[in-house]
Amino acid sequence: MNFGSLSQLFYDSLAISAWKSYQGTKWALRVNPSSGNLHPTESYLISGPLEGLADLPTISHYSPLKHSLEIRANFSDKVWKKMVEGLPSDTIFIGLSSIYWRESWKYGLRAFRYCHHDLGHALAAINLSCACLGWRSTLVDYLSTKDLEIILGLDQVNKDEIEVADCLIAIVPNKDKSVLKLNKQIVSDDFLNLN
């Protein structure tokens, strides 16, 4: 795992793929599909120390516009070791969230359904990107929405653009076919005061 391969993961799954324009209006197209090209899904990287990014474990937001990671918070090695206990040391996590108003202004009540549809597209794109890199991904399915909001720092963010935490994916950059045994002791309390 290095900064270049991590960049490739995001580039192949969630990045801007092209720009279109028509009669003076310009808009981006992305690698992952989205209903109405509205892209309500946001992504966050949780990683240990990574050369080129940070010397400490971090939570970063992925910006498709800049194809860059925006560090939101650092946390201790102790918390990181607890998070990856029983997993390979180069494991990373990607958290996904939805911003419902990006769909609701156009689709009304159907926005909830379309946001989850787009979440599925993002999950599939990440999984395909991992497979192309020879990596494995698995859903961390035992965290509550509230726990995930705390871990991603979404419980303390601007209330004008509410993000709802959707899921967390563990990514292991190796071809080991053994079953991933995720540490069920990821405790959101460790992340409460990061932001």
Enumerate the language-model features and the residues they cover.
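Acidic, surface-exposed loops and disordered segments
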Residues: 1-195
